[in-house]
C-alpha cells in the first residue's frame, strides 16, 4: 500500500479551505497512510510565502492576499492555472527536500517537453522557465518528514494579475503559459500528462485517480 498514490482532482476551489485540508492531512497522517497529489484550480488569490515581503505586493486591488506557510514569496493563483499539491512522505521515499524540488522541476520540464516546449530550472530561483519567463512556480513545506504545498503551472489564464506583484520577489519577472507556447489550453489535458510523468519519476506502483470536489483529507 505504501507505494500507492492517490491523485485527487478537486476542480475549482477557494485557496483557504484547501490549504487547511492540507494541514489537517499532514498533521494527522501516519507512516502507513498513502501519499496523495491534489490537483486543483483556484479562484483568484495572491499567496505570500514564509519569505514574503509586503512591498512585493504592488497593488492587490480586488484580489485577496493570504499569508501562507509555504516556502518562497508572493505568487498569484487563478482560473486556467494547474496547481498540484504534493502530500508525500519524503522520509519513506528517502528524499531530501532538495531532491523533491528537483523531482518536481523535472516533472514539469518533462510534461512541457511532451508539447515540444523547452524549459529549464534555475539554481537561483526555484520553478521552471521558458526563455527566461516563468511558467511554473514552486513552494513547499516539510513537516514530520512529509511534504505539502507544491507547484502552480500556468496553462491558459489571465496573466495580468502577476503585474500587480513582484512574482516570487523578482521585480519585472515575466510570466509564460502553456497555451501561448503551442501547448493545450485545457487543464484536463495537462493534468493527464503531469500524472503520467509523476508516476514514472517518483516511482509509484499503483495509482488511484479520484475526481471529487470534496476536500476532506482522509487517506
Curated annotation (Swiss-Prot):
UniProt keyword list: Acyltransferase, Cytoplasm, Transferase
Q: What is its EC number?
A: 2.3.1.181
Classification via InterPro entries: aa-tRNA-synth_II/BPL/LPL (IPR045864), BPL_LPL_catalytic (IPR004143), Octanoyltransferase (IPR000544), Octanoyltransferase_CS (IPR020605)
**Name of this protein:** Octanoyltransferase
Q: What else is known?
A: In the reaction, the free carboxyl group of octanoic acid is attached via an amide linkage to the epsilon-amino group of a specific lysine residue of lipoyl domains of lipoate-dependent enzymes.
- Where does this protein act, in terms of pathway? Protein modification; protein lipoylation via endogenous pathway; protein N(6)-(lipoyl)lysine from octanoyl-[acyl-carrier-protein]: step 1/2
Example GO CC term: the record gives: cytoplasm
- Domain BPL/LPL catalytic: residue ranges: 31-206
Where in or outside the cell it occurs: the entry states: Cytoplasm
Organism encoding this protein: Vibrio atlanticus (strain LGP32)
Q: Where is this site: Lowers pKa of active site Cys?
A: 134
Q: Which family does it belong to?
A: Belongs to the LipB family.
Coiled-coil intervals in this record? none
Annotated catalysed reactions: octanoyl-[ACP] + L-lysyl-[protein] = N(6)-octanoyl-L-lysyl-[protein] + holo-[ACP] + H(+)
Residues recorded as binding substrate, renumbered to this chain, are 70-77, 137-139, 150-152
Q: How would you classify this enzyme at the top EC level?
A: transferase
Under HAMAP family, the record lists: LipB (MF_00013)
Single GO biological process annotation from the record? protein modification process
Give the positions the UniProt entry annotates as the active site: 168 (acyl-thioester intermediate)
- Say what the protein does: Catalyzes the transfer of endogenously produced octanoic acid from octanoyl-acyl-carrier-protein onto the lipoyl domains of lipoate-dependent enzymes. Lipoyl-ACP can also act as a substrate although octanoyl-ACP is likely to be the physiological substrate.
Q: Which GO terms describe its molecular function?
A: lipoyl(octanoyl) transferase activity
What PANTHER family does UniProt report for this protein, alphabetically?
A: LIPOYLTRANSFERASE 2, MITOCHONDRIAL-RELATED, OCTANOYLTRANSFERASE
Amino acid at each position: 500500500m505504501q507505494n500507492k498514490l492517490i491523485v485527487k482532482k478537486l476542480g475549482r476551489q477557494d485557496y483557504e479551505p484547501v490549504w487547511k485540508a492540507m494541514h489537517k492531512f499532514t498533521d494527522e497522517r501516519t507512516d502507513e497512510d498513502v501519499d496523495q497529489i491534489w490537483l486543483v484550480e483556484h479562484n483568484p488569490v495572491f499567496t505570500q510565502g514564509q519569505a514574503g515581503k509586503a512591498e512585493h505586493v504592488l497593488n492587490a486591488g480586488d484580489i485577496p492576499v493570504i499569508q501562507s506557510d509555504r516556502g518562497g514569496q508572493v505568487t498569484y493563483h487563478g482560473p486556467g492555472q494547474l496547481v498540484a499539491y504534493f502530500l508525500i512522505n519524503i522520509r519513506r521515499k528517502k528524499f531530501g527536500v532538495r531532491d523533491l524540488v528537483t523531482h518536481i522541476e523535472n516533472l514539469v520540464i518533462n510534461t512541457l517537453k511532451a508539447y515540444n516546449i523547452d524549459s529549464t530550472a534555475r539554481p537561483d530561483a526555484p520553478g521552471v522557465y521558458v526563455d527566461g519567463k516563468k511558467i511554473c512556480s514552486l513552494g513547499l513545506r516539510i513537516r514530520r518528514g512529509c511534504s505539502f504545498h507544491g507547484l502552480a503551472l500556468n496553462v491558459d489564464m489571465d496573466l495580468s494579475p502577476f503585474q500587480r506583484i513582484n512574482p516570487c520577489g523578482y521585480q519585472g519577472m515575466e510570466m509564460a503559459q502553456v497555451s501561448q507556447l503551442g501547448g493545450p489550453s485545457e487543464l484536463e489535458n495537462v493534468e493527464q500528462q503531469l500524472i503520467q510523468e509523476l508516476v514514472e519519476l517518483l516511482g509509484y506502483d499503483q495509482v488511484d485517480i479520484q475526481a471529487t470536489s470534496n476536500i476532506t483529507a482522509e487517506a
